[in-house]
């Protein structure tokens, strides 16, 4: 493709005149000193390539004559076919009201097309000219209602639609098809070379075809920032906050031809009607230990389609960015800059990133033990400087209680009622129980007729799993469940053994042997057709098999490939589950409910234009159970989760948040120790909270300045041209590597505070591990004095079967209950006060299981009355007093605290036992969430426990019984013993 300079206004006018007059477009006719374009290349293609690569300056882009009239400048440069609008005129035009713009559109439409409109429209509303369409910032696209009577827009010549891997090609030679999601996007920019409508009619049709979206106030604000102000953003928030809904609205409002929708997982890409990021970029799966940025760039440069994608792209959407490694992000930024020949961040591309760093981190397949770096740790992140937009409003009103619980699990700050609810949903399956009634029935009807083995709640395994999607942390557990369920069927089995040729071995993350039978549940392992809903992660049921000898296969290589996989020629026929659409813009789902023949799939490893290896297999695996990693991005109605195998940070949150209804959630072996958020992500979100004022000021400045700001913020980057030759050769002008950015931008500020918080988070992580390893089970303690705090009494109340647990700990084990004065005072206060004013935990702090009011459930929204729970705790205290098992603290029963023992002194800054902390960092407060009141309560409790140790240690042990990490750590630090009723010890171990 010819990439000669096309910079001046005169050149643009000349191109338009030549186009309208029918003269051939030669470079000599446009500019006497440049080389001729390739044969058959049109002015539209020239302008499109130049604008998408960042070569055409915004102030040189064309505008329609009517737009100039509205700008009010009679001195504007004009032409019979093309009128060039100056930057000042566009700024004036951007201030025109929505009513005025629409009024002029209707007026000109009623008057009919102007003479010679074909040549004028060709450049007036070109698909690559995003800034020069009718001012979308004033048309308020998200509120425009679809006009059912307006004719459909004609398919634009030269505009590539969604292709087979979800990307948008830049060449007419690419075989492109339109996805369902692509059809729903508003075609705001139309190339009119194949249209009989005037530019104004095209613009009006484009506006009326934008779907109507219902957005909240905070969603509208973010929508405006992305669509109208062209700012790169990072969209984040917890489950149920409307991230996907907002992304669909944004995608629908952006130009189809230059907006590329991607995700880090195939399923997430399906949900947005896009493609995987690896497929779009052309990078493939690369290893940072064996590949450099330059090597990847050269490979991408040799791929025509990927090269065209990067040059055509103006907006890049990336969902599930939490699974994007920092190295890969830096590599993408490097490739984008060099292919586009532009020093701007990502070569000037606007980024719309979405995800939650408190979900699963990136998977390091090559070095599993090596700590992965999250995306915000990338070197290029401060240059991109995305404006962080946090969604906090939840839209699942019926799931308000569950939403509150998920937010607490997300940040690892579980309150007493959340712990109680999770415990009530949990069953113990590490120990088998026998249903006595079913045992009698079994003796009567036969050994095989009745299942007598149950969990702790009397449910059999089949009752817990049938109809539920089983989520497990480890692949070995998933394989065992799938094998068992598969064996219950009696249909014929067809097996396929994977084949591999070329370098390396058959991929370890693919099943080497696939065995399926009619009636079994399966999951798709490849993105076969995103437009038809056939994405990696789609679940369905095998209904039958067809012979490839009789079946007309979609791929010519199917029969040959099948001969390498099996000694038969049968292909599975799968009916995939229906995926209900959630709103305009949803992609996929076309194949849901239909029978699909699954043919062998090829996974090819390429280096440049050469195939170095190829693996072939039927892209299916059994799906009765799936791994938690595989489930990220899914929405499941019935979920069974086992906490026993959870090992990864964020795994518990991802598993629980897959379920849409808490009533259909089964938890096996709940263990609060497994609720572990990533401390780097916690520090990042805490830093974001601390610079919230700066974020609000940045948003205000962005809106006040209109569209004058760059996608990466207010600072500017000196740009220069570079391009590749037609054969994908080297860049003509080397892109400077010493890249600069505003060192005081918001991303830099966030990173500075994150680094300042990290030592405290690391210290707390160490403290937490020590507490969990040294806390004893209260149900195993014998003949001791248990100093109870508020959380332990509430836990005793919330536990399933509190009466039996009370009997075990205090009657059978012979323990005595001792209650500090401050604990009883707090319980009485909570029982007699409506504490609705108390704010719930909304920030990612580390105050796990805190006993202060800020951690009590009054504001979490759970259905049961917390006052009743507190009253129940007081009732237990009265019963214990009547049983002579309880005694309360009396006046004078307190000793001063002993010094911190040697092994805990390194954690003294977090313990705050002897004096108020003074770190000298006034602008970076402690990450620990308990306040002064909590600290005073802990001190009073510990002083009472110290008194009991000095007085009764000869007659038995003294334990501090608590469910909070902070109090447990403070007690252990001064040499006291600690026990837990529920949450600081493994529940499963107590049932022995």
UniProtKB/Swiss-Prot annotation:
General function of this protein: DNA-dependent ATPase and 5'-3' DNA helicase required for the maintenance of mitochondrial (kinetoplast) genome stability.
EC assignment: 5.6.2.3
Compositional bias annotation for Polar residues: 23-43, 173-182, 191-208
Taxonomic lineage of the native organism: Eukaryota, Discoba, Euglenozoa, Kinetoplastea, Metakinetoplastina
InterPro entries recorded: AAA+_ATPase, DNA_helicase_dom, DNA_helicase_pif1-like_DEAD, P-loop_NTPase, PIF1_helicase
Description of the deletion phenotype: No growth phenotype.
Places the protein is found: Mitochondrion matrix, Kinetoplast
Listed cofactors: Mg(2+)
GO biological process: chromosome organization; DNA recombination; DNA repair; telomere maintenance
Span of the transit peptide along the chain: 1-21
SUPFAM superfamilies: P-loop containing nucleoside triphosphate hydrolases
GO cellular component terms, semicolon-separated: kinetoplast; mitochondrion; nuclear lumen
Gene3D superfamilies: P-loop containing nucleotide triphosphate hydrolases
Main location: mitochondrion
DNA-binding region: 651-670
Pfam families for this protein: Herpes_Helicase (PF02689), PIF1 (PF05970)
Keywords carried by this UniProt record: ATP-binding, DNA damage, DNA recombination, DNA repair, DNA-binding, Helicase, Hydrolase, Isomerase, Kinetoplast, Mitochondrion, Nucleotide-binding, Transit peptide
Name under which the protein is recorded: ATP-dependent DNA helicase PIF7
Family assignment from sequence similarity: Belongs to the helicase family. PIF1 subfamily.
Description of how the protein assembles with itself and partners: Monomer.
Gene name of the encoded protein: PIF7
Record's catalysed reaction(s): Couples ATP hydrolysis with the unwinding of duplex DNA at the replication fork by translocating in the 5'-3' direction. This creates two antiparallel DNA single strands (ssDNA). The leading ssDNA polymer is the template for DNA polymerase III holoenzyme which synthesizes a continuous strand; ATP + H2O = ADP + phosphate + H(+)
Molecular-function annotations in GO: 5'-3' DNA helicase activity; ATP binding; ATP hydrolysis activity; DNA binding; magnesium ion binding
Sequence positions that bind ATP: 237-244
KW rRNA processing (keyword) present: no
Positions of region (Disordered): 20-43, 145-182, 190-209
């Amino acid at each position: 493709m010819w990439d000669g300079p096309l910079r001046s206004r005169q050149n643009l006018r000349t191109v338009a005149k030549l186009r309208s007059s029918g003269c051939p477009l030669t470079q000599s006719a446009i500019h006497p000193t440049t080389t001729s374009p390739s044969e058959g290349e049109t002015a539209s293609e020239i302008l499109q390539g130049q604008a998408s690569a960042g070569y055409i300056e915004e102030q040189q882009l064309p505008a329609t004559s009517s737009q100039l009239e509205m700008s009010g400048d009679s001195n504007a440069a004009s032409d019979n076919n093309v009128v060039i609008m100056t930057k000042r005129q566009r700024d004036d035009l951007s201030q025109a009201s929505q009513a005025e713009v629409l009024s002029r559109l209707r007026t000109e439409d009623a008057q009919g097309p102007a003479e010679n409109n074909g040549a004028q429209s060709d450049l007036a509303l070109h698909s690559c000219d995003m800034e020069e369409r009718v001012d979308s910032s004033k048309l308020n696209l998200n509120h425009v209602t679809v006009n059912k009577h307006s004719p459909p827009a004609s398919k634009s010549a030269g505009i590539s639609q969604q292709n087979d891997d979800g990307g948008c090609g830049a060449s007419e030679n690419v075989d492109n098809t339109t996805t369902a999601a692509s059809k729903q996007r508003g075609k705001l920019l139309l190339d009119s070379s194949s249209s009989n409508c005037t530019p104004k009619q095209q613009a009006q049709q484009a506006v009326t075809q934008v779907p109507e979206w219902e957005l909240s106030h905070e969603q509208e604000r973010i929508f405006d920032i992305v669509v109208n102000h062209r700012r790169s953003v990072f969209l984040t928030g917890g489950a149920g906050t409307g991230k996907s809904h907002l992304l669909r609205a944004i995608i629908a409002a952006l130009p189809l031809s230059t907006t590329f929708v991607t995700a880090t997982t195939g399923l997430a890409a399906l949900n947005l009607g896009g493609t995987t990021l690896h497929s779009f970029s052309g990078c493939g799966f690369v290893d940072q230990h064996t590949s450099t940025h330059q090597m990847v760039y050269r490979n991408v440069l040799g791929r025509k389609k990927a090269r065209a994608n990067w040059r055509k792209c103006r907006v890049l959407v990336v969902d599930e960015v939490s699974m994007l490694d920092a190295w890969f992000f830096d590599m993408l930024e490097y490739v984008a800059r060099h292919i586009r020949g532009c020093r701007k961040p990502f070569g000037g591309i606007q980024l719309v990133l979405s995800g939650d760093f408190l979900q699963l981190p990136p998977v390091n397949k090559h070095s599993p033990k090596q700590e992965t770096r999250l995306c915000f740790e990338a070197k290029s992140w401060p240059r991109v400087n995305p404006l962080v937009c946090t969604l906090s409003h939840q839209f699942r009103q019926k799931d308000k209680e569950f939403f509150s619980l998920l937010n607490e699990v997300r940040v690892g700050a579980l309150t007493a009622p959340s712990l109680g609810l999770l415990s009530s949903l949990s069953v113990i399956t590490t120990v088998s129980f026998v249903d006595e009634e079913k045992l009698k029935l079994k003796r009567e009807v036969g050994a095989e007729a009745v299942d007598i083995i149950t969990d702790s709640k009397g449910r059999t395994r089949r009752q817990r799993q049938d109809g539920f999607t089983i989520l497990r942390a480890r692949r070995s557990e998933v394989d065992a469940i799938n094998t068992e369920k598969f064996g219950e069927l009696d249909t014929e089995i067809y097996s396929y053994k994977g084949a591999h040729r070329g370098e390396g071995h058959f991929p370890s993350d693919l099943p080497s042997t696939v065995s399926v039978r009619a009636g079994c549940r399966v999951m798709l392992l490849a993105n076969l057709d995103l437009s038809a809903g056939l994405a990696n992660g789609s679940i369905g049921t095998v209904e039958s098999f067809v012979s490839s000898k009789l079946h007309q296969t979609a791929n010519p290589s199917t029969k040959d490939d099948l001969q390498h996989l099996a000694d038969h020629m049968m292909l599975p026929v799968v009916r995939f589950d229906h995926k209900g659409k959630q709103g305009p813009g949803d992609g996929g789902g076309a194949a849901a409910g239909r029978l699909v023949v699954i043919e062998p799939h090829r996974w090819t490893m390429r280096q440049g234009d050469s195939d170095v290896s190829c693996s072939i297999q039927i892209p299916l695996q059994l799906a009765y159970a799936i791994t938690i990693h595989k489930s990220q991005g899914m929405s499941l109605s019935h979920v069974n989760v086992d906490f026993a195998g959870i090992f990864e940070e964020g795994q518990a949150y991802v598993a629980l948040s897959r379920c849409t209804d808490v009533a259909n959630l089964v938890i096996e072996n709940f263990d609060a120790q497994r609720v572990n958020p990533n401390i780097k992500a916690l520090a990042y979100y805490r830093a974001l909270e601390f610079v919230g004022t700066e974020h609000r000021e940045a948003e205000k400045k962005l809106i006040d300045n209109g569209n004058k700001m760059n996608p990466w913020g207010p600072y500017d980057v000196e740009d220069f041209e570079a391009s590749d030759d037609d054969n994908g050769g080297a860049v003509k002008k080397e892109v400077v590597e010493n890249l600069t950015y505003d060192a005081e931008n918001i991303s830099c500020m966030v990173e500075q505070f994150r680094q300042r918080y990290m030592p405290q988070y690391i210290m707390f992580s160490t403290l937490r591990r020590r507490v969990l390893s040294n806390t004893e089970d209260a149900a195993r303690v014998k003949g001791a004095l248990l100093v109870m705090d508020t959380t332990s009494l509430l836990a005793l109340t919330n536990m399933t079967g509190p009466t039996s647990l009370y009997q075990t700990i205090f009657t059978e084990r012979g323990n005595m209950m001792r209650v500090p004065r401050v604990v009883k005072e707090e319980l009485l206060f909570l029982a007699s006060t409506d504490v609705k004013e108390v704010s719930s935990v909304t920030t990612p702090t580390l105050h796990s299981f805190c006993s202060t009011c800020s951690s009590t459930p009054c504001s979490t929204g759970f259905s049961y009355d917390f006052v009743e729970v507190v009253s129940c705790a007081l009732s237990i205290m009265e019963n214990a007093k009547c049983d002579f098992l309880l005694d309360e603290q009396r006046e004078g029963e307190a000793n001063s605290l002993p010094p911190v023992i040697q092994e805990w002194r390194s954690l003294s800054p977090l313990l705050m036992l002897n004096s108020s902390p003074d770190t000298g960092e006034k602008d970076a407060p402690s990450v620990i969430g308990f306040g002064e009141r909590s600290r005073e309560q802990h001190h009073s409790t510990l002083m009472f426990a110290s008194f009991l140790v000095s007085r009764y240690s000869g007659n038995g042990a003294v334990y501090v019984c608590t469910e909070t990490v902070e109090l447990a750590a403070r007690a252990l630090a001064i040499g006291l013993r600690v026990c837990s009723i529920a949450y600081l010890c493994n529940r499963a171990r107590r049932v022995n």
